[in-house]
């Protein structure tokens, strides 16, 4: 979204999100997806003083539930999907959905992924003008003739009688919905469809999201992704499977002091879609790593597929690299851009 706005509007754009905050091209460290209210207002002030005319902000469900963004008049809000996550905080999916829906009482236009039925929940009590995007007939901005390749996605985007072709150098089915949301935001801001598609065609991938790790001299592939929910793990493994000639190996864990309900679900998804499972740690925090792993294993049915357990993530990755064979695809899921492990209350 940031790239598209900069290319189409020739302006300076701020970014607030999980990976990093940016004021134009200057990186500002981030501690949480959406800062606390006071810090957020200070960051927005810095962006304005630096000449930013637009800000792309990732607004977490926590921030919405805790009123961190109350009073901010969003020009456009966007909805990607609603899948099980953060139930340690929200307790129920209904409460989680209701928290996300608050965004659409704060924005002028809501761009929503109509391929996820939860978009209807987002519009309950909404004060915005909705713009639906997707692959179905309900979408005002619709993807047709979608082509998935190992290194890109191509499709025709139709808006009424208008149509434009776009090729994006980021593989995966989820790129289709992400691209449509970006184009929907462009249209809500008055940017022409063809101009937005042209800009999107030059966008690069995001660090730690379906990122291929260079492995010189090796005949297997290593892929890093931030997938840490059942739905996200299903998406990345399904995408990786399309381009895997050998075995699909999944290295994953679940966060400690977080939603325990998704742990067996993650195990079940990995068991269904991967050929080899390596269950390890992913920010265990104050929980015992093996206790988390046991809850993941509870979701893995009796299977002839190899299932390895190694609570030390570094050792788990090294072990996987040793037994990987020609044409294997190794998916390191859960950490994405993170280069640390949270043990107890410390980042290691």
Question: What do these predicted ranges mean?
Answer:
Residues 1-21, 26:
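Walker A (P-loop) phosphate-binding motif
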Residues 17, 58, 81, 113, ...:
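Short beta-strand segments
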Residues 27-37, 85-90:
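Flexible beta-alpha connector loops of hexameric P-loop NTPases
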Residues 31-60:
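Conserved nucleotide-sensing/catalytic segment adjacent to the nucleotide-binding pocket
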Residues 50-52, 56, 74-221, 245, ...:
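Acidic, Mg2+-coordinating active-site environments of NTP-dependent enzymes
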Residues 63-70:
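Conserved helix/coil segment N-terminal to the catalytic DExD/H
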Residues 127-129, 181-348:
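ATP-dependent carboxylate-amine ligase
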């Amino acid at each position: 979204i940031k790239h598209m706005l900069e290319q189409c509007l020739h302006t300076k754009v701020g970014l607030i999100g999980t990976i990093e905050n940016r004021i134009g091209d200057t990186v500002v460290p981030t501690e949480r997806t959406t800062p606390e209210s006071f810090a957020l207002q200070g960051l927005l002030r810095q962006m304005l003083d630096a000449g930013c005319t637009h800000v792309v902000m990732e607004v977490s469900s926590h921030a919405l539930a805790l009123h961190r963004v109350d009073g901010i008049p969003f020009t456009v809000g966007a909805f990607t999907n609603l899948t099980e996550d953060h139930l340690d905080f929200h307790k129920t999916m209904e409460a989680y959905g209701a928290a996300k829906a608050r965004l659409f009482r704060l924005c002028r236009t809501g761009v929503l992924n109509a391929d996820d039925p939860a978009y209807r929940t987002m519009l309950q009590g909404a004060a915005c003008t909705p713009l639906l995007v997707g692959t179905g007939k309900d979408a005002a901005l619709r993807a047709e003739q979608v082509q998935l390749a190992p290194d890109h996605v191509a499709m025709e985007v139709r808006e009424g009688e208008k149509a434009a072709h776009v090729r994006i150098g980021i593989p995966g089915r989820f790129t289709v919905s992400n691209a449509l949301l970006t184009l929907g935001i462009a249209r809500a801001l008055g940017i022409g469809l063809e101009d937005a598609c042209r800009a999107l065609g030059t966008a690069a991938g995001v660090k730690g999201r379906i990122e291929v790790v260079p492995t010189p001299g090796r005949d297997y592939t290593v892929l890093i992704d931030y997938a840490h929910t059942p739905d996200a793990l299903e998406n990345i493994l399904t995408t990786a499977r399309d381009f895997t000639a050998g075995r699909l190996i999944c290295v994953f864990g679940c966060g400690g002091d977080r939603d325990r309900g998704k742990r067996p679900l993650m195990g079940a998804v990995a068991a269904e879609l991967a050929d080899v499972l390596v269950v390890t740690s992913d920010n265990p925090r104050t929980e015992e790593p093996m206790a988390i792993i046991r809850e993941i294993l509870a979701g893995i049915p009796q299977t002839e597929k190899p299932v390895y357990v190694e609570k030390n993530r570094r050792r788990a990755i090294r072990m996987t690299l040793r037994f990987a064979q020609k044409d294997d695809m190794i998916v390191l899921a859960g950490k994405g851009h993170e280069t640390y492990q949270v043990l107890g209350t410390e980042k290691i």
